[in-house]
């Protein structure tokens, strides 16, 4: 049995879960970002990041690597297109989702997401910079969608990587209305059985987690990593980030453990 160390609110684990469900692969799920599961997570990934997939003696800790492994291990139904050109396109959009989209949405959502509970105000210009960059990516996606309404000829890892990020834009005040092809893509994605079931699962998880008297997650500190820090610094918010570090509200993983995609 495959074990997935995940979290219902992580876009990376949401992508992996949808790929597993797309391929009808049974798996055990562990909400590894819950404080109670922290030691179990560190045991398989010293950086304490999700997702982590364990299949027998094999441990894989990067979502793109997990997807690639699942495509090789369970080739049908495929989640990558058939032609080299479309495969490259799908991987390119997955990379945009995993790096740039994640960084922007993470950095401007700290004052929106209930998991963070920030009571201060964002630094001036941060949210506006995020909205501008998000709208630029949406314009690129609008131009990239094919005649079938997906990134490639049919639903692929590109769509499953983009959807968890783009489905959160409404909460951030970013509308898809100026992008009719993206709007139609969003409708088509929500009509897919795998995505429909996934959204119901996320909704149930949210109700369970936030209806509890005490959150199972660490709410006072935020984990930052390369892409998220890079986007922030590129837009001139070095002083704000340094203040977060000084106040102990930011966690930067420093482990350089070789326990990564470990094959005995």
Language-model features, listed with the residues they occupy:
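Long, charge-rich low-complexity segments
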Residues: 204-239
């Amino acid at each position: 049995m495959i074990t997935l160390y995940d979290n219902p609110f992580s876009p990376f684990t949401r992508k992996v879960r949808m790929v597993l469900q797309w391929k009808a692969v049974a798996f055990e799920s562990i909400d590894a970002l819950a404080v109670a599961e922290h030691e179990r997570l560190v045991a398989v990934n010293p950086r304490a990041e999700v997702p982590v997939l364990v299949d027998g003696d094999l441990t894989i800790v990067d979502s793109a690597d997990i997807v690639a492994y699942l495509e090789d291990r369970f080739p049908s139904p495929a989640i990558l297109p058939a032609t080299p050109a479309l495969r490259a396109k799908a991987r390119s959009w997955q990379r945009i989702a995993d790096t740039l989209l994640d960084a922007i949405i993470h950095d401007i959502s700290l004052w929106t997401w209930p998991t963070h509970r920030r009571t201060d105000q964002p630094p001036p210009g941060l949210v506006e910079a995020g909205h501008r960059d998000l709208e630029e990516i949406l314009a690129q996606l609008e131009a990239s969608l094919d005649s079938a309404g997906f990134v490639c000829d049919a639903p692929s890892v590109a769509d499953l990587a983009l959807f968890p990020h783009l489905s959160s834009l409404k909460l951030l005040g970013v509308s898809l209305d100026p992008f009719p092809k993206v709007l139609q893509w969003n409708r088509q994605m929500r009509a897919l059985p795998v995505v429909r079931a996934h959204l119901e699962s996320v909704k149930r998880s949210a109700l369970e987690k936030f209806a509890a008297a005490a959150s199972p997650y660490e709410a006072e500190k935020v984990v930052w990593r390369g892409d998220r820090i890079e986007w922030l610094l590129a837009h001139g918010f070095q002083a704000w980030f340094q203040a977060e570090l000084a106040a102990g509200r930011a966690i930067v993983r420093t482990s350089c453990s070789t326990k990564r995609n470990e094959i005995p």
